[in-house]
Amino acid sequence: RPQEVSLQKDRNDWQELRPEQKHIFTSNLRYQTLLDSVQGRGPCLAFLPFCSLPELESCILTWDFMESIHSRSYTYIIKNVYSNPADVFDKILTDKYITERAESVTRTYDELINDGQRWLLDGTVQGLSTKELKRKLWRALVNVNILEGVRFYVSFACSFAFGELKLMEGSAKIISLIARDESQHLAVSQHIIKNY
């Protein structure tokens, strides 16, 4: 639970950050919030319909739940650090750099979810073979693996750098807890890919 980490010092640190530091911290937080919001619904919607192993179903449900906690954690940071949290939230989807970075993840999820649901309901999708549907599943899995193993960690490094400077340490602590979870998600996605 993110509430277990105090952000009092972060509120004070925020006031002392230079404008470019505030920009980096905020842009990074917006990116993390958007991608974890996507991940908060992605694994269950995309992968669960194709899962037949009870232990893997439980794993995917847990993964999905953990991602929703991460999204709440970013919300907790934003609400406790910024005097006007709505300004941060409102700009998440209007920042073209953030949405462009997230597009490859959302695109592969959307393709799999849309075609997969039609396939499951109708048993067919016009012009889509079983092989192509499997290819879309594979692409989504690989994309999620890259998200969990590379993209999140690039953004985490930024948060950790603030912590190393003894700035925004509460936020860095919360991010370190999220990073711990993401390493588990990375292991899960790699296991699925290796055994697919």
Describe each region flagged by the PLM.
Residues 1-196:
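Non-heme di-metal
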